[in-house]
């Protein structure tokens, strides 16, 4: 009988566990290892950059820490692991730095009446420890004392299985060190589903001296920024027909008492418990960490009560695979644990932290206030949208439900950046923070941006376009987006998003004006006084003339201003404005004269708008990007009332154009750098397109395209732009532009009439004229400008005969090739070899490879003189170097020993292509090389000798056999 507190021994008590407990241990460890493999197998410098990675790992660790907790018989509920964790202050004070911060929060919170607050603080501590890579260092002292563990856990708990605990810590170390090789040290048989779980055998240190292990936080915490840590914690991309677990913040209401758990199931998986408020301001007040040390989002992330996966699932469903890690699904089978949240205090919404800059729709806050007050189940229908996070909005609760649809973008990790505030009011933490684990059909990301004690903490949905706040203008909404930090794919999607915003705004204005016209017509029909109608008509015409005069100077100023609209853009004329306002009334004119919402706030806020903001550079205002075009267009309507950004409805709903993130490939148990195809894994390729259109691929084209027929070529492209895939009506195909390099038609956004030399025309016709190419082709040709990709001998060998300059360069390259081979074996030619390296290597090593830069330099006459200078320097060295003189040839025909010839002397030397021997051109008159004839005669003589020896051996064998047989007969 071994003492319980004598340290951890491998396999202790494992053989006495029932089959059900071993299966649960296997399932928990398998889920953890699958998640860790998905995090560390991508060679990303930040393991939390993977979409939904931190959320899934938190869920797996919650399942392990909840497994086997002893139930509280007095309160008839399961205790939380916070009591188990917080005693690390006494077991290992050096490792309790992070725990003490959360202990102070729990002790200062006076509103807690049950264990739900402990659960919230424990889950916050778990998220914080995983984010800062210090969870294993904190768990080691706790797991080293088995007697202490038995105070909180049953004998069948996961933490009392030494083999599984060792594997768990190994997985945590792999994440903390971002080293997938540590996973290979775990015995693979540990995860095999057998009747008896084998003992764990690792190739590294075990847990023998755990009680004495200490943890010292590194000093580099203040310098590290963990992008994508909490930002992806509560995100999930909407998927049609799928239900997902999520977390939402109820704005108010007392905590509900939990239901009794059924069987051996953790509380986080069987029920949803709403925690009482936890004061985060107390944490900021008592915590010794600076805002930098707390990183971007330390304690502002909500708690999700459904992290722990169900232990009653079949073992076949235990491994969800890393593909769900990529798309953010907490449960691919769509299980939900419905609960109802009651709200009794709708007035307390001002003290909560719902931000208008979060990725949640405004109606979700309203549903928490209104729908939950009636006791019904709140069903949120918010749809997420990707964007850079905006830091400039005041944290206010928005009410009023608006039905709109927004697109979800492709998976792109965007690090949120700080930006100047657009308002004078700073976001303050004005009340306690209620935590609740709540299930709904769509996840609620709950992005928060808080500022307390001078420190900013950002917890935004990473790469998510936030929803505009109530009444926020389009100019303010578009100007605050950080498009400069977006990836290329995100910028492409932003192009469509901003275009849809402008189109939706214009259509909304038209709709409002048409409705006003109809109302006025109805009023006029009721009004029978003809004199009043004539008077109203005169007033409308007069106001129309005044408005037209006011618009003309504004557009003249725009033509001479910093922002200019391209010729392809549609110009707004006075006739158009007259048509728009022809049926306006006095109220209508007054509405159009109202200033924009942000412009009329105050001078301080207007000075921070897009036009005058110092955060946007001067070159950005002059650029032709989508956001610059949008802002320039909106700037012309500053004096008029524009619809708020929150009032827009997207033209293409989500159900009409469903999009979701592409699943990542299966995780690798080892580092891709060590695999057989490591070079392939390093390439991050995202294949895009559909059955009708695919984006152009980088390809080298050697053939000249035939003269295109626009109607036939566009029909082959399915009337879509070859660059962006936008559909064009057959009546407008004349607006498409032809790319001479790819031989396809592009829209005006993807083809800006850039001109480049076409490689196929250079190689076929020696034509260096510049032709119109698309933006994609231009970028491709610029990238390959210096790459030796064109073999003139294989593509068009007749070009040497047609172009004298090219043939001269070819002869010089032949001489340099022979010289360089000779100088490589001469110890006195090191400086000369360095001068040879000043030109690209293919010019002196491969005779017929050219780049576009080489061909252009040849045509201009610049390449020939450079190569001729190197040739003269090499010939001078050979004349003076005795080592190189010894490598020369003596002509076999004239046998002139005074005239040593070399292969690079093309004017007097002829080199045999077979044996590389050199002769004088005047002496070499016969058709064959004498050295080749000697070598051939020698080979034939050797062949005859080998054949004769083989035949002689074959004839001797029968004679020896007959003599042996005669000797045997004589002996008998």
Swiss-Prot record:
Keywords: Autophagy, Endocytosis, Endosome, Immunity, Lysosome, Neurodegeneration, Phagocytosis, Phosphoprotein
A Pfam family matched in the record: RUN
Region: Interaction with PIK3C3, residue numbers: 49-180
Biased composition (Low complexity): 338-368, 563-581
Documented effect of changing residue 248 to A: Disrupts interaction with YWHAB
Region feature (Interaction with YWHAB): 204-447
Compositionally skewed regions (Polar residues) per UniProt: 378-401, 436-446
Region Interaction with CYBA, residue ranges: 567-625
Record InterPro entries: Autophagy_HostDef_Reg, RH_dom, RUBC_PIKBD, Run_dom, Run_dom_sf
Molecular function terms from GO: phosphatidylinositol 3-kinase inhibitor activity; phosphatidylinositol phosphate binding
The protein's assembly and partners: Associates with PI3K (PI3KC3/PI3K-III/class III phosphatidylinositol 3-kinase) complex II (PI3KC3-C2) in which the core composed of the catalytic subunit PIK3C3, the regulatory subunit PIK3R4 and BECN1 is associated with UVRAG; in the complex interacts directly with PI3KC3 and UVRAG. Interacts with Rab7 (RAB7A or RAB7B) (GTP-bound form); Rab7 and UVRAG compete for RUBCN binding; can interact simultaneously with Rab7 and the PI3K complex. Interacts with CYBA and CYBB; indicative for the association with the CYBA:CYBB NADPH oxidase heterodimer.
Illness association: Spinocerebellar ataxia, autosomal recessive, 15: A form of spinocerebellar ataxia, a clinically and genetically heterogeneous group of cerebellar disorders. Patients show progressive incoordination of gait and often poor coordination of hands, speech and eye movements, due to degeneration of the cerebellum with variable involvement of the brainstem and spinal cord. SCAR15 patients manifest cerebellar ataxia in early childhood and delayed motor development with delayed walking. Additional features include dysarthria, upper limb involvement, abnormal eye movements, and hyporeflexia.
Annotated PANTHER family: PHOX (PX) DOMAIN-CONTAINING PROTEIN, RUN DOMAIN BECLIN-1-INTERACTING AND CYSTEINE-RICH DOMAIN-CONTAINING PROTEIN
Protein name according to UniProt: Run domain Beclin-1-interacting and cysteine-rich domain-containing protein
Organism: Homo sapiens
């Amino acid at each position: 009988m071994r003492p319980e507190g004598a340290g951890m021994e491998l396999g202790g008590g494992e053989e006495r566990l029932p089959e059900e407990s071993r299966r649960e241990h296997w399932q928990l460890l398998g889920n953890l290892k699958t998640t860790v493999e998905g995090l560390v197998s991508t060679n990303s410098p930040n393991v939390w950059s993977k979409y939904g990675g931190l959320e899934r790992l938190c869920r797996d660790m919650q399942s392990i820490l909840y497994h086997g907790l002893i139930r509280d018989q007095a309160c008839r509920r399961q205790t939380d692991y916070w009591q188990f964790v917080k005693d690390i202050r006494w077991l290992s004070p050096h490792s309790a730095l992070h725990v003490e911060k959360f202990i102070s929060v729990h002790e200062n919170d006076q509103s807690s009446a049950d264990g739900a607050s402990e659960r919230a603080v424990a889950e916050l501590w778990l998220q914080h420890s995983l984010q800062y890579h210090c969870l294993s260092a904190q768990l080691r002292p706790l797991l080293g004392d088995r007697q202490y563990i038995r105070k909180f856990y049953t004998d069948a708990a996961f933490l009392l299985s030494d083999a599984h605990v060792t594997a768990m810590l190994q997985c945590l170390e792999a994440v903390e060190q971002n080293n997938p090789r540590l996973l290979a040290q775990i015995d693979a048989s540990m995860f095999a589903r057998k009747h008896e779980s084998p003992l764990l055998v690792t190739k590294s240190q075990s847990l023998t001296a755990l009680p004495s292990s200490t943890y010292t936080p590194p000093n580099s915490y203040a310098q590290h920024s963990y992008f994508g840590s909490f930002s992806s914690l509560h995100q999930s991309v909407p998927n049609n027909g799928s239900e997902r677990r999520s977390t939402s913040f109820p704005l108010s209401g007392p905590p509900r008492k939990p239901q009794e758990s059924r069987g051996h199931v953790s509380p986080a998986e069987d029920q949803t418990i709403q925690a009482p408020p936890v004061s985060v301001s107390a944490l900021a007040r008592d915590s010794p960490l600076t805002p930098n040390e707390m990183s971007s989002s330390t304690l502002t992330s909500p708690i999700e009560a459904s992290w722990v996966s169900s232990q009653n699932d079949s073992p076949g469903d235990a491994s969800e695979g890393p593909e769900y890690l990529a798309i953010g699904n907490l449960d691919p089978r769509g299980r939900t644990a419905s609960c109802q949240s009651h709200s009794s205090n709708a007035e307390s919404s001002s003290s909560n932290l719902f931000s208008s800059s979060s990725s949640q729709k405004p109606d979700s806050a309203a549903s928490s206030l209104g729908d939950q007050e009636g006791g019904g189940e709140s069903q949120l229908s918010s749809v997420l949208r990707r964007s850079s996070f905006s830091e400039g909005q005041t944290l206010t609760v928005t009410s009023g439900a608006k039905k709109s649809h927004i697109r979800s973008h492709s998976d792109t990790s965007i690090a949120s950046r700080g930006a100047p505030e657009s308002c004078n009011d700073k976001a303050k933490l004005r009340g306690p923070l209620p935590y609740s684990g709540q299930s709904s059909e769509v996840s609620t990301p709950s992005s928060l941006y808080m500022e307390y004690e001078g420190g900013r903490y950002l917890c935004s949905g990473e790469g998510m376009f936030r929803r505009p706040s109530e009444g926020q203008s389009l100019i303010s909404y578009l100007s605050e987006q950080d498009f400069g930090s977006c990836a290329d794919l995100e910028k492409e999607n932003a192009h469509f998003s901003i275009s849809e915003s402008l189109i939706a705004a214009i259509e909304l204005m038209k709709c409002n004006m048409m409705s006003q016209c109809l109302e006025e017509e109805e009023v006029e029909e009721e009004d029978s006084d003809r004199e009043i109608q004539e008077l109203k008509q005169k007033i409308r015409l007069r106001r129309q003339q005044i408005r037209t005069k006011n618009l003309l100077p504004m557009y003249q100023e725009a033509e001479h201003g910093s922002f200019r609209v391209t010729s392809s853009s549609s110009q707004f004329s006075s006739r158009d404005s007259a048509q728009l306002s022809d049926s306006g009334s006095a109220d209508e004119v007054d509405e159009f004269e109202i200033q924009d919402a942000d412009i009329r706030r105050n001078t301080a806020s207007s000075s921070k708008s897009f036009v005058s903001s110092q955060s946007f550079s001067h070159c950005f205002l002059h650029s032709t990007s989508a956001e610059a075009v949008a802002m320039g267009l909106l700037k012309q309507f500053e004096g008029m009332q524009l619809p708020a950004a929150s009032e827009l409805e997207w033209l293409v709903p989500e159900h009409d154009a469903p999009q979701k993130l592409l699943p990542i490939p299966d995780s690798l148990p080892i580092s891709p750098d060590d695999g057989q195809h490591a070079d392939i894994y390093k390439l991050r390729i995202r294949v895009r397109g559909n059955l009708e259109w695919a984006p152009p691929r980088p390809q080298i084209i050697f053939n000249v395209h035939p003269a295109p027929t626009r109607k036939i070529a566009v029909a082959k492209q399915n009337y879509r732009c070859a660059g962006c895939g936008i559909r064009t009506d057959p009546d407008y195909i004349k607006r498409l532009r032809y790319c001479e390099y790819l031989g396809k038609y592009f829209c005006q956004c993807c083809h800006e009439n850039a001109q480049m030399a076409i490689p196929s025309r250079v190689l076929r016709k020696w034509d260096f004229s510049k032709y119109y190419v698309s933006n994609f082709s231009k970028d491709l040709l610029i990238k390959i400008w210096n790459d030796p990709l064109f073999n003139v001998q294989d593509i068009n060998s007749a070009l040497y005969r047609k172009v004298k300059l090219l043939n001269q360069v070819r002869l010089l390259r032949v001489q340099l090739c022979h010289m360089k081979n000779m100088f490589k074996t001469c110890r006195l030619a090191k400086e000369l070899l360095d001068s040879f390296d000043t030109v690209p290597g293919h010019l002196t090593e491969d005779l017929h490879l050219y780049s576009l830069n080489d061909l252009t330099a040849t045509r201009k006459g610049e390449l020939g003189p450079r190569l001729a200078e190197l040739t003269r320097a090499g010939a001078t060295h050979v004349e003076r170097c005795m080592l190189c003189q010894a490598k020369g040839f003596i002509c076999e025909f004239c046998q002139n020993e005074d005239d040593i010839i070399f292969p690079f002397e093309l004017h007097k030397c002829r080199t045999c292509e077979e044996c590389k021997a050199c002769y004088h051109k005047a002496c070499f008159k016969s058709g064959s090389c004498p050295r080749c004839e000697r070598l051939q005669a020698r080979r034939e003589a050797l062949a005859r000798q080998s054949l004769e020896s083989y035949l002689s051996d074959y004839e001797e064998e029968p004679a020896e056999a007959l003599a042996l047989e005669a000797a045997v007969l004589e002996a008998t």
